[in-house]
Amino acid sequence: MNKTILALAISMMASGAAVAGGDFGLEVQNLLRAQSFKFFGVVKPLTASETVSVSRAPGQTPKDLIKLAPGLNAEFVTRKAGQNSDQMAFWPNDIKPTHIITCIEDFRDPVDNVVGAYPNGQVKFGPSIQRVNLKTGAVETILRGLSSCDGIRRTPWNTIVATEERDDGGLYEILNPLAISELTVVTRGASDIIDSTGATVAGQVEYRGAVGKLAWEGLDLSQQGVVYYGDEERPGSGGANADGGSLFKFVPSTVWDGTVVTSLSQSPLVAGNVYAYQASCQNRTSSSFPQFGQGCEIGEGAWVKVDPANLRTSADANSATGFYRPEDGHFDPLYTGSGVKFCWTNTGNAGAKNYGEVNCVMDTNPVGTGEVTIDNPAVNAHGLTYLADSAEAKGFAVAAANRMVEGDTDLNQPDNLAFQPVTGNMYVIEDNPFGDVWACLRDSNDRDIKTDGCVKILSVRDGSAEPTGFTFSGDGKTAYVHVQHSSDTACVDGSDCANNDGYPTDDLVKITGFKINGK
């Protein structure tokens, strides 16, 4: 708990202030709400989620569609983003972006997701990746032919990577998202790309098979080119006793050295190995480390090698730790320790009273120092290969995962995640009807290792929609969010929310008014 809040709580009790029903926890919760301007830069948080649905319609303002904490303002960037617009990345940087590059989470379907044909008769799929001009709101399609494009990031070497949330989903890398338009992936899982005339286009988009196939969502990439990501899989969905999705990392064969990438052949994503986090029931110096099994979900663990051709099956077979639908994930920008701190959401199922969580893993040596294979029939890791770290006593690369945010009856089913620059506050976005966006404090110098508290700052007013892709620009004072998959019944031809290029639309909203240190 933040020391300021604790001191205030003690002061109020000492002065005889009544704590309703003796509920100290509720009083602390209310104290945080009362100081929301100091800690979150908003006048005050929302007290409740929206409950009365407001359908999408022509002529609306953003505040017709989202309920905002007092002090925040909103405007449409565009009402013409492709329906099912999901995560987004700024281009060419976070500080002064000119465009947002977005994923469209729709299936590749030769019947249901065809919006027409090009002049040469070639099938025109719905959009998969679009760019939005932040000055004009103009929306242009970069790429078609993916299935359920979801996670998207700008890499440290200034390319764009986009991923598919399908069981056999892949990752595709784009050299320059402003230099190409109306390209199509001929076959998923390959780098065969054509333009609107049917001509082959080489060197602009590459499928990255080395990172593997799985149901992608969030990811982050280190300066060296190490990629962290999860598999959005519910436990039991793959059959009896099947684990939930695992947490993976790709370690490139050649790390990025900071050289400007002018060709996709120079990307560190060309080749490498994939490992899955395997929580251990024993500490890193134990003679039985890594010792794994049911009940070991957090704490110190090792990185077991898996087969990128089928990551989910391989992770299960090699006893990687499973979670309940790992979804979005990002590095903590204020982490100052060795390596990286990667935080990700596990959505859970509120209907089953599994309210979800946000976990963070600290990985001190992301690249490792080669591999080590266990040859000891007396331990349950016999025959498995792991990422090595020669600086560790047992020789294994070790990461430590713990829970940062635990869901409850109000904050639950976390889906997306964002860190606010400057403050490092974590924003948690729900996957719910009338979904909320929560702002969560960092952990301070108290006893626990969890957030010091969360407040609600946004609630979607359309019960058919959800907030997604929430992210901050580099100054931490401006946020963007998609109001995804609204019912568009009222958006008739010619209206501001009508179809765009033969495809239904979503709203991209810009939110301003966040204060940092009172400014």
Regions found by a protein language model. Give the residues of each.
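Gram-negative bacterial Sec-dependent N-terminal signal peptides
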Residues: 1-20
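Sequence/structural signature of beta-propeller domains
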Residues: 21-519
